[in-house]
Amino acid sequence: TDDARLVYRVIQEGQAAGGTAINYAKVVGLLRNKPGKVIGIQVRDVLTGAEKEIKAGLVINASGAWADELRGMIDKPARLRLLRGSHLIFSHERVPLDDAVSFLHAQDHRPVFAFSWEGATLVGTTDIDHDHPMSTDPWISEQEVDYLLSAVNHIFDCLHLTRDDVISTFAGIRSVLDTGKADPSKEARDEIL
């Protein structure tokens, strides 16, 4: 799935149904009526610093990994555990996969996958706690590179892949409900409304 394209499509559908989409805006506060019901948001244009109130009949917190920031604005406790998933990208010539494969990492028996993606081969993913500020883009750590290289070299031992074979990396943050499990991979991937 091209997640950027999916998000754009959801935005288009929302606009077609009468919604308004704004970009480069951060929610900095919630608007409330006298009884305390949330009736809108205060947003800041992150490019200009200008702020604006936007009123709404219904405010939905669909902010993913940032959801606890908004929950804090209504005095609700944090519920999320932020996990980073990182990936390595190899040239298709170096890792010539035409089909998707999934296997268990020899070290910890976590699932790892590899598949053809955008003319290259993608290998992932890690599953570690993300303890960095959400205001910065996530990045893959040296340990994650080693972890994924170890996995792919174990399964495709004839390739002898090194860091020099990695043409790109990327990482993303996924939020899961924090149940206090020691192993991030054991947290449930459930959604709640």
Regions found by a protein language model. Name each.
Residues 21-23, 61, 123:
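General beta-strand structural signal in soluble alpha/beta enzymes
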